[in-house]
Design a protein with these regions (language model features):
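Short, Lys/Arg-rich cytosolic juxtamembrane segment immediately N-terminal
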Residues: 3-13
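Poly-acidic low-complexity segments
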Residues: 9, 53-54, 120
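Hydrophobic membrane-insertion alpha-helices, especially the h-region
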Residues: 12-28
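N-terminal pre-ligand scaffold of iron-sulfur
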Residues: 31-104, 138-159
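Domain-level signature for proteins that mediate thiol-based redox and metal-cofactor handling
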Residues: 86, 119-121, 128-130, 141
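Short Cys/His-rich "knuckle" micro-motifs
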Residues: 102-107, 122-124
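Short cysteine/histidine-rich metal-coordination sites, predominantly Zn2+-binding motifs
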Residues: 108-118, 126-136
Length: 159
């Protein structure tokens, strides 16, 4: 009789452990296969050979994605993020290592969508590694200004 009770307990414990393993593997699988989508880029036109972005639209410290369409029809995506104070990080939405897969913002951090590397915001706008390819820009009259020729030259990364 004691032996039967002991076997029932082991049986129930085994079934319980199996249920817990199934639940954990299902949750883990769902988390691992979760696809994070890029926020759509805001289309920006060139005017007088310059692409301008209102600083008030990008001064919240979050990642902002923009797209400029070249005369040949290539969409050149670039990102802008406030690094702190009045310093901005401006770069292409691609890198030399992973290509034009883009970046996402996850829990306040900028992350490469392909290799999942977390970027230090202070290095955005600097070359190297998986950092966004830098874009030359200027700030004036409440605008971030990028020369059209700079974005036209960057089209080679998005073909």
């Amino acid at each position: 009789m004691a032996d039967d009770i002991h076997k029932k307990r082991w049986g129930k414990a085994s079934v319980g452990a199996l249920i817990v393993m199934i639940i954990l593997s299902s949750v883990g699988s769902a988390y691992a296969n979760k696809k994070e989508e890029l926020v759509p880029a805001v289309s920006v036109p060139a005017k007088d050979q310059m692409v301008s972005i209102d600083i008030n639209k990008v001064n919240d410290g979050h990642l902002h994605r923009f797209a400029y369409r070249t005369k040949k029809g290539t969409q050149v995506r670039f990102i802008v993020v406030l690094k702190g104070g009045s310093a901005y990080g401006v770069g292409l939405d691609c890198c030399e290592i992973c290509g034009p897969t883009g970046y996402i913002e996850r829990e306040g951090q900028i992350v490469c969508k392909l290799c999942d590397v977390v970027m230090n915001k202070q290095t955005i706008g600097l070359p190297g590694g998986c950092n966004p390819i830098p874009v030359k820009y200027g700030v004036g009259n409440g605008q971030i200004r990028i020369e059209q020729k700079e974005l036209d030259a960057a089209a080679k990364y998005f073909r």
